[in-house]
C-alpha cells in the first residue's frame, strides 16, 4: 500500500476519528494524525485497516476553513491529490484545494461515500436495514395502525369506538359505556392512536384521587404510555425546572381535587398547551344553570383551552338529563347552550330510532315508511337505495345497513356520544352469590360495645365505617399485635374453603392492605396455602410479579389477596371464584370488585362468596346490596342514584346494626326504586346510539383483521434479528416467553425500554393478558419502534459488499443493489405517513443499467450471498470504484420514474380521501349540528398542507450493496 506524507486516509475500525493525515512513513509502519481528535495511530504498512479518501467529480467537499466546493476535476502529483472546482459560497470557479487542507471532521453519511471510504457494514445489517424500511412502510399503511399494540382482548365495540374517534382531528367525545365494558381501555386506545400518529403529543388525564394509580398502571401496562403523576410535591419540585411546572412532562395524570384547589395551578394547567384532555368519572362534575360546582368550572376552563376532550362516565343520561346536558356542554358549548332546547331535541330522536329498528327488523317497508326515511336522510339521490332496501335482491341487506349508517350520521348525538350496554354486548358470564352467615365472636362484641361508649361523639358516618371492620376495632384496643385471626370465624371458613377447592384460583378482596398481609401469613403458616399479596404499598413491578405468580397454572399461587386500592385497574378473568372478606362502603366499589373477574372473555360463571358476621354492619350491607339493589348478581346502574337518596338512613343502620326497625321497609323501597329506574333505563335506551357505538359487523371484521395480524411471523423473525444485531441477549423461557437482557457489546450503551435487569417479552396476546410481567411485543411496541429508529436514523447497514458464487456468470461480474427511499417531510400532526410513509424502492443493477430486482426477490437473493471481511472489501471497492460510480449514475436516471409513480399515487389517495371526508361532513353539517365548524376547517387546512407536502416529496439513496461474482 503506497503511503505519502500529507495523504488523507480514514480508519476502517474507528471512523469516529475523522480524516487522518499521513505524518510519518518508515520501512514497516505508517503514522496517521487525526486532527479532529488530536490522536495518533501507528499501523503496519503491509496490512493496515485504513482506506484512502479520494473524492470524484460531482462530490461536494469542505475545506478546513469551512467553505465548500463542488469538485470538477481531480489531479494527482507525487501521490497527493488536488481538487479543482467551484466554491459554493462565492461561486468562484477554478479553485484548487489540496487534500491536506480538507476538513478533518469529515463524516460520510451517503451510502456511496461510506462504501468508497471503506466504512463497510456487515451483510446482515444491510438486510436488516432493508427489512426495517419495508416493514415500517407497510405498518404505516395498515388501516388499523395504532390499534394493535395494546395489551387488551380484541373486543369489537371497544375497537369500533377507538377506530372512529382515534382518527379524528382533536376529538371531543363522551364515552358513556356501562360499567365493565371498558371505557378506560377505549380512552387508552384513542390516546395511543393519537400519540402514535402524531395527532397529539401532550396529554392531561384528570381523575378522582383514588383512581390515579389505576390510570397510571393501565396506561403503562396496556399501552406502554409512561405518564407522570402530579401531586403537590411533584408540582413544587417542577417549579424549580420551568416557569410552568406542567411543561416538564408530555403525559400527565393528576386528581380533580389537585387541579381545582389552587387558582395558580389551574392557570398553569390551562397554559400548558395540551392536545388532549381526559376526564374520568365526569358524572361527579355537578352543574346547574344557576350554580355550577367549582369542579365543573375548573374542567370547563380547561376544556376551553384544550382542542381534544374525552369525558368518561358510567351514569346513563336517563338518570339525570340535566347533568348529561352539562357534560355535552363541556364538549361543545356552542352546540349545547340551551337545556330546554336540548330536551326538546332528544324527544325528536324517537322516530329516527324507530326507523332504524324498522330497517334492522328486515320487514317490508310501507310507502309511508319509505317517504319518512327519504325525508329524514334528505339526500336527492336516495331513491335507488330505498328501492334496493325494500327489494328481495341480494343487495337488500347491504342497502339497509347503508341507510342505517346514513341515519346515524345525520341524527342524534352519535358523533359526540358513545354508549354500549351489557344488553347490546354479548360475552358476559353469570354471577352467583353465596352468602355465609357466621356468629359474631365475643371478643368483637366486647370491642364494639367499648367503641360505642368511647366513640359516642363520632359522626354516624365514622361509626358506620368503623362497624364494617370489627377486626380493626378490636386492634384499636388490643394493639397492632392482636391476633384477631385466631378467633374470627371468617378466617376458619376461608381456610376450609380454600383447602376444599385446591384446584381453583381464588381472588380474595378486603378493604385494607394490613388485612391482606395478615391473611397471607395465616394461610401460609397454618395450611401451607400459596397466596400472593397485592396492595397499594407495593411497587408496580412487585404487583406485576404477584399477578404473574397468581396467573401461573401449575406452580402459581392458589390465592391472590388484594386490598381495595391495590386491585384497581387489574383484571383476573382467568379466575372465576371471588371471596369478599369484607364489604365496601358503596355500590360503585362493589361493582369495581366484581369487575376484576366479570369481564368480557370470562369463560366461567362467577362465584361470589361473602362470609359475613351477624349483627354487624356487614350483615346490614349484604342484605341491602343483594335484596335492595340486586348488585351482586347483576350490574347495578341505579346503585349510585339510590345510594345517594337513602344515604342518611343507610348510614344510621350501619352505625347501629342491632337496631333494625324499619330496615325491611327500606330494602323494599330501594328494590321498588331500583326496578322503576331499571324499567325507565330500558324504555329510554337509545337503540340508535347503541347500534352506532357497537359497530356491528364492521367492528367484528376489524377485530378479526387485527387477530390475523397477531400471527405475523415476519415480526418475530425481524425482532429476533434486530435484538441480535443490537446486541441484546435472548433467553427462551418456554410458554411463548423470552427474557431479554443487555450485553456488553451493544450498538448503544443504553437501549430505551431495556432495563439493566432485563425484561420478559411475548409475541402472544393471550400470554400477555395472563402474564402481566411479560411485555406484549407488536410492531407498535416501543422496543420495536426504538429499534427501528436506531437502525434507520443512523448509518447501520447502509453500505456493504457481498460475494455471489455463481458459475453461470463470469468471475468479477458486478451487481449493485440500491435501496432508495421515497419520502416527504412534514409536521407529524399532518399524519403524512397514511399516504406516503418513507417507502423503499429496491433496484438491482448490472453494469449496463439493467434492473433485475423484479426477477430476483430480495430474501432469496440474500440467502445466496456470502459475506466479505472489511479489509478485503475495501480492496475490492477500490478496484471497481469507477464502475460503481457509473452504475450509480444509471440508477439515478432510473429512480425518478418509480418515485414519481409512488408520489402521484399518494397525492391521488390523499386528495380523494380527504376531499371525500370533507364533502361528507359538509353535507351532514346541514342536517346534524353536532359537526363542529373547527373540525371542518381543520380537515380543509389539513388537506391543503398534505397536498403541498406531497408536492415537495423527494427521494434519496438510503443503502447500497456491491455484489461481486466469484466461482470459489
Curated annotation (Swiss-Prot):
Entry-linked CDD domains: DEXDc_RapA, SF2_C_SNF
Binding residues for ATP: 177-184
Molecular function as annotated in GO: ATP binding; DNA binding; helicase activity; hydrolase activity, acting on acid anhydrides
Keyword annotations from UniProtKB, A to Z: Activator, ATP-binding, DNA-binding, Helicase, Hydrolase, Nucleotide-binding, Transcription, Transcription regulation
One biological process term in Gene Ontology: regulation of DNA-templated transcription
Family annotation (SUPFAM superfamilies): P-loop containing nucleoside triphosphate hydrolases (SSF52540)
EC number: 3.6.4.-
Positions of the Helicase C-terminal domain: 490-662
PANTHER family: DNA ANNEALING HELICASE AND ENDONUCLEASE ZRANB3 FAMILY MEMBER (PTHR45766), SWI_SNF-RELATED MATRIX-ASSOCIATED ACTIN-DEPENDENT REGULATOR OF CHROMATIN SUBFAMILY A-LIKE PROTEIN 1 (PTHR45766:SF6)
Protein name: RNA polymerase-associated protein RapA
Lineage of origin: Bacteria, Pseudomonadati, Pseudomonadota, Gammaproteobacteria, Enterobacterales
Gene: rapA
Amino acid at each position: 500500500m503506497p503511503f505519502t506524507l500529507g495523504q488523507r486516509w480514514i480508519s476502517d475500525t474507528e471512523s469516529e476519528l475523522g480524516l487522518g493525515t499521513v505524518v510519518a512513513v518508515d520501512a514497516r509502519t505508517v503514522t496517521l494524525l487525526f486532527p479532529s481528535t488530536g490522536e495518533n495511530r501507528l499501523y503496519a504498512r503491509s496490512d493496515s485497516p485504513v482506506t484512502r479518501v479520494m473524492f470524484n467529480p460531482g462530490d461536494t467537499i469542505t475545506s478546513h476553513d469551512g467553505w465548500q466546493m463542488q469538485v470538477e476535476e481531480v489531479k494527482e502529483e507525487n501521490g497527493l491529490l488536488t481538487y479543482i472546482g467551484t466554491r459554493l459560497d462565492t461561486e468562484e470557479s477554478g479553485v484548487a484545494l489540496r487534500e491536506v487542507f480538507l476538513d478533518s471532521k469529515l463524516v460520510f453519511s451517503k451510502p456511496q461515500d461510506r462504501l468508497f471510504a471503506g466504512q463497510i457494514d456487515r451483510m446482515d445489517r444491510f438486510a436488516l436495514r432493508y427489512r426495517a424500511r419495508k416493514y415500517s412502510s407497510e405498518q404505516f399503511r395498515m388501516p388499523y395502525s395504532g390499534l394493535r399494540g395494546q395489551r387488551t382482548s380484541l373486543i369489537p365495540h371497544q375497537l369500533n369506538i377507538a377506530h372512529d374517534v382515534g382518527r379524528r382531528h382533536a376529538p371531543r367525545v363522551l364515552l358513556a359505556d356501562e360499567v365493565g365494558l371498558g371505557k378506560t381501555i377505549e380512552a387508552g386506545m384513542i390516546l395511543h392512536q393519537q400519540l402514535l400518529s402524531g395527532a397529539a403529543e401532550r396529554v392531561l388525564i384528570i381523575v378522582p384521587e383514588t383512581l390515579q394509580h389505576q390510570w397510571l398502571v393501565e396506561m403503562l401496562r396496556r399501552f406502554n404510555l409512561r405518564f407522570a403523576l402530579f401531586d403537590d410535591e411533584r408540582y413544587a419540585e417542577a417549579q424549580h425546572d420551568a416557569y410552568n411546572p406542567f411543561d416538564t412532562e408530555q403525559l400527565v395524570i393528576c386528581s380533580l381535587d389537585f387541579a381545582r384547589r389552587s387558582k395558580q395551578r389551574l392557570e398553569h394547567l390551562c397554559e400548558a398547551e395540551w392536545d388532549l384532555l381526559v376526564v374520568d368519572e365526569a358524572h361527579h362534575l355537578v352543574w346547574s344553570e344557576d350554580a355550577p360546582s367549582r369542579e365543573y368550572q375548573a374542567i370547563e376552563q380547561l376544556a376551553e383551552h384544550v382542542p381534544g376532550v374525552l369525558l368518561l362516565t358510567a351514569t346513563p343520561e336517563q338518570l339525570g338529563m340535566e347533568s348529561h346536558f352539562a357534560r355535552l356542554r363541556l364538549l361543545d358549548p356552542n352546540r349545547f347552550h340551551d337545556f330546554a332546547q336540548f330536551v326538546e331535541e332528544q324527544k325528536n330522536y324517537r322516530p329516527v330510532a324507530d326507523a332504524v329498528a324498522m330497517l334492522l327488523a328486515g320487514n317490508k317497508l310501507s310507502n309511508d315508511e319509505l317517504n319518512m326515511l327519504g325525508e329524514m336522510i334528505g339526500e336527492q339521490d336516495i331513491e335507488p337505495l330505498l328501492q334496493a332496501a325494500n327489494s328481495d335482491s341480494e343487495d337488500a341487506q347491504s342497502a339497509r345497513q347503508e341507510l342505517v349508517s346514513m341515519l346515524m350520521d345525520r341524527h342524534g348525538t352519535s358523533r359526540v356520544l358513545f354508549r354500549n350496554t351489557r344488553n347490546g354486548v354479548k360475552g358476559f358470564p353469570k354471577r352467583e352469590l353465596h352468602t355465609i352467615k357466621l356468629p359474631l365472636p365475643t371478643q368483637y362484641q366486647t370491642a364494639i360495645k367499648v367503641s360505642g361508649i368511647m366513640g359516642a361523639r363520632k359522626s354516624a358516618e365514622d361509626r358506620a365505617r368503623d362497624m364494617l371492620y370489627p377486626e380493626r376495632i378490636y386492634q384499636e384496643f388490643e394493639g397492632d399485635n392482636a391476633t384477631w385471626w385466631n378467633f374470627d370465624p371468617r378466617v376458619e371458613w376461608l381456610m376450609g374453603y380454600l383447602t376444599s377447592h385446591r384446584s381453583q384460583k381464588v381472588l380474595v378482596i378486603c378493604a385494607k392492605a394490613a388485612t391482606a398481609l395478615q391473611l397471607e401469613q395465616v394461610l401460609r403458616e397454618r395450611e401451607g396455602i400459596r397466596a400472593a399479596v397485592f396492595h397499594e404499598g407495593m411497587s408496580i413491578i412487585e404487583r406485576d410479579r404477584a399477578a404473574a405468580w397468581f396467573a401461573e397454572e401449575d406452580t402459581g399461587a392458589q390465592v391472590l389477596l388484594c386490598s381495595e386500592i391495590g386491585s384497581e385497574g387489574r383484571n383476573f378473568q382467568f379466575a372465576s371464584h371471588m371471596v369478599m372478606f369484607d364489604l365496601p362502603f358503596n355500590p360503585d366499589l362493589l361493582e369495581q370488585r366484581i369487575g376484576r373477574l366479570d369481564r368480557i372473555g370470562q369463560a366461567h360463571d362467577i362465584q361470589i362468596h361473602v362470609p359475613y358476621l351477624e349483627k354487624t354492619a356487614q350483615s346490614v350491607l349484604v342484605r341491602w346490596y343483594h335484596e335492595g339493589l340486586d348488585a351482586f348478581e347483576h350490574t347495578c346502574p341505579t346503585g349510585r342514584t339510590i345510594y345517594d337518596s337513602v344515604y342518611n338512613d343507610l348510614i344510621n343502620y350501619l352505625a347501629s346494626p342491632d337496631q333494625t326497625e324499619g330496615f325491611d321497609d327500606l330494602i323494599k323501597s330501594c328494590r321498588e326504586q331500583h326496578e322503576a329506574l331499571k324499567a325507565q333505563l330500558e324504555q329510554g335506551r337509545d337503540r340508535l346510539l347503541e347500534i352506532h357505538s357497537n359497530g356491528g359487523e364492521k367492528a367484528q371484521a376489524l377485530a378479526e383483521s387485527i387477530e390475523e395480524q397477531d400471527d405475523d411471523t415476519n415480526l418475530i423473525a425481524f425482532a429476533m434479528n434486530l435484538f441480535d444485531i443490537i446486541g441484546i441477549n435472548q433467553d427462551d423461557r418456554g410458554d411463548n416467553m423470552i427474557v431479554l437482557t443487555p450485553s456488553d457489546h451493544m450498538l448503544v450503551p443504553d437501549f430505551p425500554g431495556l432495563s439493566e435487569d432485563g425484561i420478559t417479552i411475548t409475541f402472544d396476546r393471550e400470554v400477555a393478558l395472563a402474564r402481566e410481567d411479560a411485555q406484549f411485543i407488536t410492531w407498535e411496541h416501543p422496543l420495536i419502534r426504538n429499534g427501528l429508529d436506531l437502525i434507520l436514523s443512523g448509518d447501520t447497514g447502509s453500505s456493504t459488499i457481498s460475494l455471489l458464487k455463481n458459475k453461470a456468470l463470469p468471475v468479477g461480474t458486478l451487481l449493485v443493489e440500491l435501496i432508495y427511499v421515497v419520502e416527504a417531510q412534514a409536521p407529524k400532526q399532518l399524519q403524512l405517513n397514511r399516504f406516503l410513509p418513507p417507502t423503499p424502492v429496491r433496484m438491482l443493477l448490472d453494469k449496463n443499467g439493467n434492473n433485475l430486482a423484479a426477477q430476483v426477490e430480495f430474501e432469496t437473493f440474500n440467502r445466496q450471498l456470502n459475506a466479505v471481511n472489511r479489509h478485503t472489501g475495501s480492496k475490492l471497492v477500490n478496484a471497481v470504484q469507477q464502475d460503481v460510480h457509473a452504475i450509480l449514475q444509471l440508477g439515478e436516471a432510473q429512480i425518478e420514474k418509480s418515485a414519481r409513480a409512488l408520489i402521484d399515487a399518494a397525492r391521488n389517495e390523499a386528495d380523494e380521501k380527504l376531499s371525500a371526508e370533507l364533502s361528507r361532513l359538509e353535507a351532514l353539517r346541514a342536517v346534524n349540528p353536532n359537526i363542529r365548524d373547527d373540525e371542518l376547517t381543520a380537515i380543509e387546512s389539513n388537506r391543503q398542507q398534505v397536498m403541498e407536502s406531497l408536492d415537495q416529496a423527494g427521494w434519496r439513496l438510503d443503502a447500497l450493496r456491491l455484489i461481486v461474482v466469484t466461482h470459489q
